[in-house]
A protein has these predicted regions:
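Short Gly/Pro-enriched turn/cap motifs at secondary-structure boundaries
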Residues: 7, 18-19, 54-60, 107-113, ...
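Glycine-rich beta-strand-centered segment in the early N-terminal region that forms part
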Residues: 18-34, 48-95, 131-136
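Mid-domain Rossmann-like dinucleotide-binding core that forms the NAD(H)/NADP(H) cofactor-binding site
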Residues: 82, 137-217, 222
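NAD(P)H dinucleotide-binding glycine-rich loop of Rossmann-like/cofactor-binding domains
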Residues: 91-169
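Glycine-rich cofactor phosphate-binding loops and adjacent beta1-alpha1 units
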Residues: 158-160, 184, 201, 205-284
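Residues in the short beta-alpha loop(s) of Rossmann-like NAD(P)-binding domains
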Residues: 196, 265, 291
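C-terminal hydrophobic helical "lid"/dimerization subdomain
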Residues: 218, 247-251, 292-342
């Protein structure tokens, strides 16, 4: 089969590799659509990921498709079933899993390789995080289940209350998903900050009450205070993964606010925090990572409901052979998400 392999920093190659064969408890799907992700872009640019993968490796982690092979012991699925698989599954046995803190599981089973014609799903993911796709839901929408599950997890951990003013920093796919979830389901006022006018316009379509191009602003915290009676935002969600923006997020918060530091920064980076602000303003700073089986199911259900036009996030469909060009387009912010069709 044709598959993308990551060998290092911006070193992505399409190669012919053996078709996968399922072992006990596993299934193999024919990929119908694999969507690109901001995490993929960061991994491509950085040459690896602290938890998910180490080069050389098959690449990509969002996909939907159809089961074409079933391993020994698999009884809940049949060849021909349309499915979407999360890119991980918890062990269900460790200290954290016993406390239902599944995203902290040190034994997470990770799966990469969606940018390929076929994808093998490991047995733990088949058991805990493989879901049937509703008949009328296109593969490219179902493939966005994993990132939306992360966003639903992040939203649930952000202490959002009715009527809050919520600031989202970042107009990538994750930031826009946060806007959509917050605006449609939580009755809050969302202020979106980003650097691309086209993406900010999509943010408005997804429910942002106000959008701001940070390139045209002297100072983001000052603008936020103008919209919040000089206090700052009730909740701030950072969705860029840049240490400087983590610091900006904290500066945007009112006393008593929650700051969700959602975007993963490069390894071994640090930030500076004003201890006086943190202590006397009683700020809550949260790092939120990945998703859980509960949110994977909730994400697919939300996408399938079609209440929110998540298709706005898919800029185009492209053949797998164009993958490197697509990543260059993502780097220059010409596209948000692209559905790769093997």
């Amino acid at each position: 089969m044709l598959a993308a392999l990551l060998y290092g920093k911006e070193n992505l190659r399409l190669e012919t590799v053996p078709d996968p064969t399922p072992r006990k408890g596993e299934v193999v799907i024919q990929v119908g659509a694999a969507t690109t992700c901001g995490t993929d872009l960061k991994v491509w640019r950085r040459g690896g990921h602290a938890k998910m993968l180490k080069p050389p490796t098959l690449f990509g982690h969002e996909a939907a498709g159809q089961i074409v092979a079933i391993g020994e012991g698999v009884t809940d699925w049949q060849i021909g079933d349309r499915v979407v698989a999360n890119n991980s599954a918890p062990c269900m046995n460790c200290f954290f899993c016993q406390r239902q803190e599944y995203s902290l599981c040190p034994n997470l089973t990770w799966n990469n390789g969606t940018f390929a014609e076929y994808l093998k799903i490991p047995a733990p993911i088949v058991k805990y995080n493989l879901l049937p796709i509703p008949e009328d839901l296109p593969d490219e929408l179902a493939a966005m289940t994993e990132p939306l599950a992360c966003v639903l997890h992040g939203t649930a951990r952000s202490n959002v209350k009715h009527g809050d003013k919520v600031v989202v920093l970042g107009d990538g796919a994750i930031g826009l998903m946060f806007v959509a979830k917050l605006a449609h389901d939580l009755e809050v006022e969302v202020l979106l900050f980003g650097g691309n006018d086209d993406r900010l316009e999509i943010g408005k379509k997804l429910g942002a009450a106000q959008t701001f191009n940070y390139r045209q602003l002297p100072d983001i915290p000052t603008v936020i205070k103008e919209y919040t009676d000089s206090w700052g935002a009730d909740v701030v969600i950072e969705a860029t993964g840049l240490p400087s923006v983590w610091e900006t997020a904290i500066a945007c918060a009112r006393p008593g606010a929650t700051v969700n530091l959602f975007g993963g920064c490069p390894r071994d980076t640090t930030i500076t925090v004003n201890t006086e602000q943190l202590h006397y303003s009683e700020l809550t700073l949260k790092g939120v990572f990945h998703n859980t089986p509960e949110f994977v199911r909730a994400a697919l259900s939300l996408i399938a409901s079609r209440r929110i036009p998540f298709e706005l996030l898919i800029s185009e469909q492209r053949p797998l052979q164009d993958l490197e060009t697509v990543f260059c387009d993502m780097r220059s912010r010409k596209v948000i998400k692209v559905a790769m069709i093997p």
